[in-house]
């Protein structure tokens, strides 16, 4: 599975945030779509497999697990190292609350 840092995610990318709903509500990368890890297997059909799939969480652990899940099913995924914490720290566009 490919991994990029937060600064390498292109504008307008399909960015899937796998944190739980309450975490996503607190702070999120602008444009991210929330599909919590706990719901991921039942919602994987929501992904646009014709576009690159960037997966993000808080720091990079859960997103790596989801990325591995996708790769095992023949779906390419890109893990965003540093996660939402790194995204915010880098000053990238995000929403709080």
Task: Kindly give the residue locations of the regions a language model identified.
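Rhodanese-like catalytic fold shared by cysteine-dependent sulfurtransferases
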Residues: 1-14, 18-52, 61-97
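Short, surface-exposed ligand- or partner-binding patches at beta-edge/loop junctions that are enriched
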Residues: 56
């Amino acid at each position: 599975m490919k991994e990029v840092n937060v600064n390498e995610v292109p504008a307008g990318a399909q960015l899937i945030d796998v944190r739980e709903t309450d975490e996503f509500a607190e702070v999120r990368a602008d444009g991210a779509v929330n599909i919590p890890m706990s719901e991921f297997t039942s919602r994987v059909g929501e992904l646009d497999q014709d576009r690159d799939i960037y997966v993000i969480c808080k720091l990079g652990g859960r997103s790596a697990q989801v990325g591995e899940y996708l790769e095992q099913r023949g779906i390419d995924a890109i893990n965003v190292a540093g996660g939402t914490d790194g995204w915010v720290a880098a000053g990238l566009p995000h929403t709080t609350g």
